[in-house]
Amino acid sequence: MDDYRRIADRIAADITGGRLRPGQRLPPQRAFARRHGIAPSTAGRVYAELVRRGLVVGEVGRGTFVRATAPDGQPGIALTEAAGAPLVNLELNYPAVPGQSELLAPALAPLLRPDALGEALRPAAAAGTPAARAAVSALLARGGLPAAPERIVFTGNARQAIAATLAALVRPGGRVGVEPLTYPLVKEIAARLGLALVPLATDAEGPVPQAVADAHRSAPLSALYLQPALHNPTSLTTSAGRLRQLADCVHRLGIPVVEDRIWAFLDPGGTPPLAALAPGLVHLVDSLSKRVAPGLTVGFAVVPRDRVKAVARAVRSGGWSAGAFALEAAVRWLGDGTVDRLVAAKRQDARRRQRLVAGKLAGFTVRSDPAAYFAWWELPAPWRADTFTAAARAHGIAVTPGTAFCVGPGRTPDAVRLGLGSAPEPQLARALQTLAGVARDGAAAGTG
């Protein structure tokens, strides 16, 4: 083995063993060369090898830093440092409010009777149960989408509903138009299904219809995947006028749409679903995970009538069916008002957390919405997303770098997403204060 690779192996072992921590700066290459008794050119090859392995990131004029995640990890997944210290989790977004378990428990008690439990443990089909279809249909109607129960297809969660609808709509090799910043797991779903994601220009009102038409003219788009309500990560809600333009555009071009509205429940005054404007083309995806709890959830898609069988087949073949127990619990929570009470509490909770962001990150460029559970922080120069993520992790805080959301080539944004829903409120306040200090110190020193 070449000498530089042996040295790289030793540094890699220090990183994976926790002796070199995320965010820690490696010495300049000349200093590294002197310390190891090697030529500067060999030190350069060591650093290049560490970059190739995904263990460090180099910033011209700033230095080389240990990355925030392992090379085979996905940004936004790890919850503990290598050394075992818990992180303040501003990556994953699992909002819970005080007293949530006490609200949920009463509806589950009757399911513990042997007769009820036996029914709830039976296999569930993609069509769910009549009671589940009726309950979700009523929920959707309150959100501005009258949906016939027979158009509803159930899955285990929203990710599975997205995967099933895309699998039903797009053949391997097909092109799917998306916002240039999109839900990271859609990138994984597309890779697994063999789909090509095509970034579409957006502006302050949402996706640009002309960008859809131009991309479709270049090579036909098989579908669009859009987040018109509280877009993740930017919190943008597409304007009502732009939604009408998009509906006209997809009607004219005949492009089906997967509309992700998983966060729309937080903003009752927001725009209506795109599916209400183009019901023959739009497949609306939603879930109870954010409204209720991520551990016992139900996802669903409202599908055009002529696509119901195809989406149901995709659910079966993917093994993405909802559990009967979760369906029965959902019916009870929707019927007794539990979901409505949790939604009201989470709307208030999200607004309190956004006020913390506004206060602790005052003076920075932060894109968000008062109703959202996340914020998109455009970092001050000279910070880069990867190095800031590593520096945050070195301070015990996990954030998601902008690269996790980017689609297509081009310069990635120097931004991070802050997930506000998982950390307890006092912990969130302290974490935001710490991050503000890290950002200011790095910007002042010019060492981002």
Question: Which residues fall in each region the model found?
Answer:
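Conserved core of the PLP fold type I
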Residues: 119-253, 264-283, 441-447
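N-terminal basic, amphipathic alpha-helical segments
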Residues: 1-112, 121, 316-322, 344-349, ...
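Hydrophobic residues in well-ordered beta-strands that form the structural core
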Residues: 178, 199, 257-259, 330, ...
